[in-house]
Amino acid sequence: GAGVTGIVMSQDCVDMYNPKVVRSTMGAAYRVPFCYVDDLAEEVKQMKEAGICTYAAHLEGKNSYDEEDYRKASAFLIGNEGNGLRDEVADQAQVYIRIPMKGQVESLNGAVATAILTFEAARQRR
């Protein structure tokens, strides 16, 4: 994998024990710690206070994801493809980043965006 140490999700995210999720993750859902929180914006605030740099994958990101340094403790904030991140969560991010697109594509689904960002972080940490 990409070396992810944990996943924090809002209560309205997918059920990680859903059989389709377990199948699509090939069991990784059981190997990476995860939790659901009631107030994701507050969790992001606590991450920042703990020295974790928070990056929002956002259409308004000025820097491309591959221009940032992820060698330090990092958290990626990923929204769903229909609505993106909720404003109150995105507002807590320290840095807005974008994944450049070609052609008519406006956004990627959350799994694809997460894979791109986490594997870039893993590449930098080698």
Model-predicted segments: where are they?
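Structured adenosyl-cofactor binding patch, chiefly the S-adenosyl-L-methionine
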Residues: 1, 16-29, 87-126
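RNA substrate-binding interface of SAM-dependent RNA methyltransferases
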Residues: 1-61
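Short secondary-structure transition/capping segments
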Residues: 19-21, 46, 66-69, 110
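Short flexible/disordered coil segments
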Residues: 49-51, 70-78, 116-126
